[in-house]
Amino acid sequence: MKVTFEELKGAFYRVLRSRNIAEDTADACAEMFARTTESGVYSHGVNRFPRFIQQLDNGDIIPDAKPQRVTSLGAIEQWDAQRAIGNLTAKKMMDRAIELASDHGIGLVALRNANHWMRGGSYGWQAAERGYIGICWTNSIAVMPPWGAKECRIGTNPLIVAIPSTPITMVDMSMSMFSYGMLEVNRLAGRELPVDGGFDDNGQLTKEPGVIEKNRRILPMGYWKGSGLSIVLDMIATLLSNGSSVAEVTQENSDEYGVSQIFIAIEVDKLIDGATRDAKLQRIMDFITTAERADDNVAIRLPGHEFTKLLDDNRRHGITIDDSVWAKIQAL
């Protein structure tokens, strides 16, 4: 089915207000969920909303909590999220990193005691739209086996890097081949994964999303490389925020809350003039996109460039929502 942006935001707002969330908080949160979905990231927008409400109802998320600054060291700050709403807090933290970067050239905010930030790419994009390089990542509950193991002991720990090119170039990737949200998107659509995404119950690589969702044997991105990167991202976020590691979140909490996150902004224009910046970025993009294609019918992609078209299509033709997901939201 298709809905308009206003219908989608209104549905989110209704559910939030029914939980006695303050009007301004409910409006801002509903706006972010709707924008994420409108951008084509259904896995961390509309599809994630029922899970968000479940955690809200369980008390994992404290909607009236206010993040507090703990430590300030010039370009580096440490904050405690107080388990406030994840996407609103993350937006505020990237805004703060940008403010620090405007003063120091670079700004880093380390956040502890946070909740799931939904679409991490929103915060990298937020920085790039203002002319900054945006880098951020989060740890999570243990949902992926480290390389060589069968048992989940590491997080998917998504990493975002956004560049202020035209259009914005952005990598938004979990340390697994696919996020659990994308496994759900493919399962609901009745599709196999385009490449292997995990192991089946016999330890064989599989493209079946439902099998991986069930047994939790998701495949690290780049095999041992994604496993290793997940581990060091967790270590950095834990140390800089003085927050919880994947091990602590998994062993001490009843669900995924109280995670640690990093937000970095770099003001490029303090290092290079605008014309030179644009020319260098354009040369990089042109060099890549003019390569001989492996398949004449498949364009060479630059990361993040597809979002402009996805957003335009959804604004023109309406936002496609899976019927079962929409039914869940209506029932909340």
Curated annotation (Swiss-Prot):
Subcellular location: Cytoplasm
Name the UniProt record assigns to this protein: 2,3-diketo-L-gulonate reductase
Function field: Catalyzes the reduction of 2,3-diketo-L-gulonate in the presence of NADH, to form 3-keto-L-gulonate.
Family named by the database record: Belongs to the LDH2/MDH2 oxidoreductase family. DlgD subfamily.
HAMAP family from the UniProt entry: Diketo_gul_reduc
MF GO annotations: 3-dehydro-L-gulonate 2-dehydrogenase activity; NAD+ binding
Keywords: Cytoplasm, NAD, Oxidoreductase
Source species, domain of life: Bacteria
Active site: 44
Known catalytic reactions: 3-dehydro-L-gulonate + NAD(+) = 2,3-dioxo-L-gulonate + NADH + H(+); 3-dehydro-L-gulonate + NADP(+) = 2,3-dioxo-L-gulonate + NADPH + H(+)
Cellular component per GO, a single term: cytoplasm
Species annotation: Salmonella heidelberg (strain SL476)
Enzyme class per UniProt: oxidoreductase
Binding annotation for NAD(+): 168-174, 224-225, 304-306
Subunit: Homodimer.
InterPro entries hit by this protein: Diketo_gul_Rdtase (IPR023689), Mal/L-sulf/L-lact_DH-like_ah (IPR043144), Mal/L-sulf/L-lact_DH-like_NADP (IPR043143), Mal/L-sulfo/L-lacto_DH-like_sf (IPR036111), Malate/L-lactate_DH-like (IPR003767)
EC numbers on record: 1.1.1.130
